[in-house]
UniProtKB/Swiss-Prot annotation:
Tissue: Expressed in forebrain, hippocampus, midbrain, cerebellum, and testis. Expressed in forebrain, hippocampus, midbrain, and cerebellum (at protein level). In the cortex expressed more in laminae II and III than in laminae IV-VI. Expressed within the pyramidal layer of the hippocampus and granular layer of the dentate gyrus as well as in the olfactory bulb. Diffusely expressed within the caudate-putamen and globus pallidus. Diffusely expressed throughout regions of the midbrain. In cerebellum, expressed within the Purkinje and granular layer. Stronger expressed in the cerebellum.
Quaternary structure note: Interacts with CAMK2A and CAMK2B in the presence of Ca(2+)/calmodulin or after autophosphorylation.
Disordered, as annotated region: 1-21
Signal peptide (UniProt feature, chain positions): none
Known function: Potent and specific cellular inhibitor of CaM-kinase II (CAMK2). Traps Ca(2+)/calmodulin on CAMK2.
Ranges where the record places region Inhibitory domain: 43-69
InterPro entries per record: Camk2n
Listed GO MF terms: calcium-dependent protein kinase inhibitor activity; protein kinase binding
Species name: Rattus norvegicus
The protein, known as: Calcium/calmodulin-dependent protein kinase II inhibitor 2
Family under the similarity heading: Belongs to the CAMK2N family.
Keyword field contains Cytoplasm: yes
Keywords: Cytoplasm, Nucleus, Protein kinase inhibitor, Synapse
Length: 79
């Protein structure tokens, strides 16, 4: 974790060409950056073998056994 000492108004420089113009006053504090960078590390990218693979699909069809048996018995047509 980093620590940054706050700047006072006397250490802040003026911006712009007009030195008598309105003052730009702001403060910048660095907070805990570990939580900022750790957010994406919780989810790891997939391994090379997992890319493009579908999850398991459950087919709920009463006719699936008949269809699969019928495909094996029929010769290919059009040859």
């Amino acid at each position: 974790m980093s620590e940054i000492l706050p700047y006072g108004e006397d250490k802040m420089g003026r911006f712009g060409a007009d030195p008598e113009g309105s003052d730009l006053s702001f403060s910048c504090r660095l907070q805990d950056t570990n939580s900022f960078f750790a957010g994406n590390q919780a989810k790891r990218p997939p391994k090379l073998g997992q890319i493009g693979r579908a999850k398991r699909v459950v087919i709920e069809d009463d006719r699936i056994d008949d269809v699969l048996k019928g495909m094996g018995e029929k010769p290919p047509s059009g040859v």
